[in-house]
């Protein structure tokens, strides 16, 4: 197996998919940093083309800051923020969106070239194009998420939309890995179905579920509710776990239940 690995040379399609995976992973990390710095609502408009460039002069910065001052989050949490502080949070959100544009171009342009040059097998084109559509849809989902934090009296984005945005990001990453893995099967003997691969799939699904539950924790800021472990304020199952009606809402909207489930 080692000799096969040493002799193996990746083709251009595999390298392209590998770079795409790294960029998506970086995007997920940058998205987490954007959330932790409370920067996600700093850009109050969705401008896929016009938004490529950040504000280039002081007047433009002031204009963007004035837009931010109109949303509930500023009034509730950042009312003492100055222009310098706004530039910092703006940078995080702008960088997140910019990386999204880069991912789209890095995936789309080589895809077109590889299809024209027949580097991708005809029967696989649908799968590759499907991932491109997912990437495009993710941009729309991102704005759909952000817009929920600009409406009414909300000071945070919807936890449902946050979980959707994060969930789709990991689906894109998984699809890229699947395309990369199947582009040229390296070691057929270890790719056969066995009990280990079944357990790996189950574990992968559980990890994905945990990630989604974590998104609900982040969206509701439920992680701040209980600071004891393994008991939650002295109870294994926190009091009020099923306090919402209908009961299914507890899974997604009850802070105690959301933290316990995670």
List each model region and its residues.
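Polytopic transmembrane helical bundles with strong interfacial aromatic enrichment
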Residues: 1-261
